[in-house]
A protein has these predicted regions:
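Acyl-donor (CoA/ACP) binding surface of acyl/acetyltransferases
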Residues: 1-18, 22-27, 58-158
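Conserved GNAT-fold acetyl-CoA-binding loop/helix
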Residues: 28-48
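Short loop/turn motifs at secondary-structure junctions and domain boundaries
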Residues: 49-55
Length: 158
């Protein structure tokens, strides 16, 4: 377990999943992240794969002993990415920045992150953690859905 201040990273427990499910359903969070919410079956299938995939490195974020969200890294099309999600009640407290900084001490590989250009809070988190803009892209957030302008951020490994 990684601990510093009031933010802790630990292995994901099965009991975290219902909290993650509700967090990813929040309309404000979905709108800000420009991400789609999964229904229960799709969510369960997604996390079942994550939890057994040896390439995925994922941690639960706790704040004051409450499950605040998750942070993880994964491979996609030959690149290593990092992503994080916080429940709305944990926004604006510096939790995402602290959690990502702690995570980066454990996963020291070169990482990329995609962030919607409209997601200013997440852009600030990435920049505070040493990520810089490496490019931009348009990405469909759902099959057949609208496309979103993304920044591609990158942070070198050590």
């Amino acid at each position: 377990m990684l601990e510093s201040g009031l933010v802790t990273l630990r292995d994901v427990a099965e009991t975290d999943l219902p909290i993650f499910f509700e967090q990813q359903r929040d309309p404000d969070a979905v709108r800000m992240a420009v991400f789609f919410s999964r229904d229960r079956n799709a969510f369960d299938a997604h996390w079942a794969k994550i939890l057994v995939d040896p390439v995925v490195f994922v941690k639960t974020i706790e704040f004051q002993k409450n499950v605040a969200g998750n942070v993880g890294s994964f491979e996609l099309q030959g690149q290593r990415y990092v992503g994080y999600w916080l429940g709305k009640g944990f926004w604006g407290k510096g939790i995402a920045t602290q959690a990502l900084m702690k995570f980066l001490r454990e996963d020291r590989r070169r990482l990329q992150a995609r962030v919607a250009k409209s997601n200013i809070a997440s852009i600030r988190v990435l920049e505070k953690c040493g990520f810089t803009i490496a490019g931009e892209d348009r990405l469909a957030i759902q099959p057949g859905g609208e496309e979103v302008d993304d920044w591609v951020y990158e942070r070198g490994g050590s």
